[in-house]
Amino acid sequence: MNNKPEYITCAAIWYKDLPTQTYPPKNIDKGIVVCGHRHNNCIDVVKTLSELRTVRFSPDGVGESVQGFMTSENRFVDRQEAMGIAKTTGQVDESKLYNPMTGLFSEDIY
């Protein structure tokens, strides 16, 4: 049994309007979640594989998306929930946060 608390593993973007993936994170019921070192890596993967842009209202847009993070428990969390997890687990130096009101940025933890 793993007694380690849930922690942030990587940046991720949930593309809600794209076709549902076969093995999504356990708290996602539609769309796909793309993971990467930074959020721009996720955007680049979608653009490269689908030629769609990460914008909502455009003929070549992906539709609704949410920037967030994946956790060690295979959950997608938004920037605000990720900030709480990262603070609880000591993954961030609270005196050096990029924009704590917006939520966690990958630059805050690595």
Q: What kind of feature is each model-predicted range?
A:
Residues 1-66, 71-110:
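Linear-motif-rich, low-complexity cytosolic tails and juxtamembrane regions
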